[in-house]
Amino acid sequence: MYRTVYHAKIYVDRVGQRSFAGLTDSKRGYGMGRRMVGLHAVFLASALMLGGCGTGNKVVNFEIPNENVTTITFFGNKYEPENVTVIEEILSDFMKENPGIRVSYESLKGNEYYEALGKRFDAGKGDDVFMVNHDVLLEMQSRGQLVDLSGLKTIQDYSDRMLRQMVEHGKIYWVPTTVSGFGLYCNKKLLKEHKQKLPENLQEWRQVCSYFKEQGITPVIANNDISLKTLAIGRSFYSAYQENREDEMFRHLNEGKEQLSFCMTPGFSLVKEFIDNGYVDAGKALETRKTSDDLEEFVKGESPFMLTGAWAAGRVEGMDPDFDFVVAPYPVLEDGGLVVINADTRLSVNRASEHIDEALAFVEFFTRSENIQKFADQQSSFSPLREGIPSSVKEIQPIVSCYQSGRTVIGTDALLEFPIWELTARASERLMKGEELEDTMKWMDQEAAGRRGGW
C-alpha cells in the first residue's frame, strides 16, 4: 500500500531568523505517513530559483560551519501540516533564543509512532525529547528511562488538576502541552432538514439515532480507535469524578480489589447497544482511521453524528468551509452531557540522552505560557495552565462551557497503573467484531490483572 510521505524543513540563519519553510511530498512504499522538520543554520541560496529564476527546481543550501552547535532530536506524532506549522514557529523561536542548540523534529502518525518509539529505545537509540501517552509512560517509568522534569521553571504555571496528574512521589516525568477533548460532532444542516434537535442527554440521543436509523441512515460515524472507548470511559467513570471518589476507585482497581469490568460495564453496555441497534456500522468503523477517514466521511454530509477528537474541528472546517457543524458534549447521561479530556501531547526527556541540559532547556521553552497557548489554540484544545485561555474555535464552544462547568472525565487518569487506553480500544474492537459483552468484560479483567504497572 502506498501513501504520501511528507518532508518539511525550516531553514534558519545565523541569528535564528526563519528564512524559509519548504514542504514536499513523494510516493514511497513505506506504508506510513512521515513528516520531518530539521532546523539548520544555513544560507538559503535558492530563494530566487523558487520564485521562478535560476536553473530548474534545484535548491542549493550552503551550511554555515559552527562547531559550537549542539543538535538534539525531537520525535513526535504530530504530523499534520497545521500542527507542524506551529511546531516550526516554536522551534524557530527557540533557535533564535538559543543559537548554540539545533533541534531536529521527526514525526510518525498514530500507533506507528509508538511502535517506532519503542523500537528506538529497545535499540538504545531513543531521541532526546519525545511525545508520550499514559500507557507508554507506565513502561518507560518502570524501566527508569525518563528524566525528572520537576525542576523546570514552567512547572509552577500548570493548573492544580494537571499537577495532580503529573506529580508522582515528588517527581515529574512528563509535561502536557494541551488538554484534548472528545466530543460529538453534529451535522446541523442534516438535523434541521429532518426536524431533529441537537441531543442534550441520552434519551434524546437515542431518539434521534432511532429516527435516522428508520430513515435508512447510520446515525453515528465511529473510528477504530478513540470513538467508542471514550464513550465507554466517559459514561463509566463520570459519577466517580462528580462524587470525588475517583482516587479510591482507581486505588482499588490498581490493587486488584475491584474488577475493571465492574466499573466499565455501564459504558460498554451503551457501546454494545449502539452497535446492536445499528446506530454505528461496526464493520465500517473497524476500517475507519481516526481524525482521517472519519472526517472525510462526515463532511459528505450524509450522517448526523461523528465521535472523535475535538482537535480535528479546524481540519473539518478546512475540508469544507461551508459545512455547518458543532462539537457537542457526549450526551450519554440522563441529565445531560460530559466531556472526556486528556492531558495531551506530553513531552518527556530521555534519561540516556547525551544532551540532557539542552533537552530540558527546549522542553522548558516549549511549555512557556505563550507557546502552550499557541499550540493549544491551533489544536482546538484546552490549556493545561492556570491562566490558560479556552480555544476560540466557534465550533467547539459547547464543549468549552461543559469543560468549564466541571462535567469532565479524564480518559487516561495518571492514577491508573495499567494501560487503560489500549485495553479500552481493544475491548471496543472485540465488541465491533461481534463478541458478547460478558466475554469482552471477562477478557478485559484478565488483561488488566496481568498488566498492572505497565506492559
Residue ranges of each PLM-predicted region?
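Short, solvent-exposed loop/beta-turn-alpha elements that line the ligand-binding surface or hinge
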Residues: 64, 148-158, 240-266, 318-319, ...
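C-terminal capping/gating helix-and-loop segments adjacent to ligand/active sites or protein-protein/ligand interfaces
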Residues: 88, 376-388, 397-454
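Hinge/lid segment of periplasmic solute-binding proteins
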Residues: 109, 133-183, 197, 206, ...
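Periplasmic solute-binding protein
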Residues: 138-145, 162-199, 217, 223-252, ...
